[in-house]
């Protein structure tokens, strides 16, 4: 059995040739499981004898969404105030690396335990940062959409979108880190 999670991302990144290469070398009677939380694709073009399990009607009643409009120049200060709430721990998503880096610098200057995690951080250090966050050693984990997919952090109560997500799929994956 071969399981490919975040298959929609492979399709978007035009990586289907890697999937074809993997399946070429797999045993003839292999089972291939494609998983995707947000994108529907024509699976019959990819494989024969397919089955779809649609979970899109499942509601996550334990996730509350609310919107707060904050002027761009006051957003870091808003994060600072959130960080001072007792037992607060949050994952903050940014659309750009420059905004993420700037916010990290400003928060650390104000003695907030905030660390950024983005594509420019090596995998070994990413794991260290995630473990520190999971162990409550960090108050804020600042991230790009790299972290919106495929991570699991128990008891994460708050996701903050520093920037409006670029599309509804990004929003779904960001919000899905809670609940």
Spell out what each predicted region is.
Residues 1-179:
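Conserved helicase RecA-like core
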């Amino acid at each position: 059995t071969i399981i490919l999670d975040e298959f929609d991302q492979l399709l978007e990144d035009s990586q289907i040739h890697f999937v074809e290469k993997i399946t070429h070398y797999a045993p003839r009677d292999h089972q291939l499981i494609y998983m995707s939380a947000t994108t529907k694709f024509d699976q019959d073009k990819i494989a024969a004898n397919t089955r779809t399990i649609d979970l899109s009607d499942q509601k996550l009643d334990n996730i509350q969404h609310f919107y707060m409009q904050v002027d761009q120049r006051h957003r870091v200060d808003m994060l600072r105030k959130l960080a001072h709430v007792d037992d607060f721990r949050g994952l903050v998503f940014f659309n750009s690396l420059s905004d993420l880096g700037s916010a990290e610098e400003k928060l650390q200057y104000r003695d907030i335990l905030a660390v950024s995690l983005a594509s420019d951080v090596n995998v070994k250090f990413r794991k260290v940062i995630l473990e520190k966050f999971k162990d409550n050693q960090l108050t804020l984990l600042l991230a790009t959409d790299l972290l919106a997919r495929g991570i699991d952090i128990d008891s994460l109560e708050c996701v903050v979108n520093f920037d409006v997500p670029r599309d509804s799929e990004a929003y779904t994956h960001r919000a899905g880190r809670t609940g």
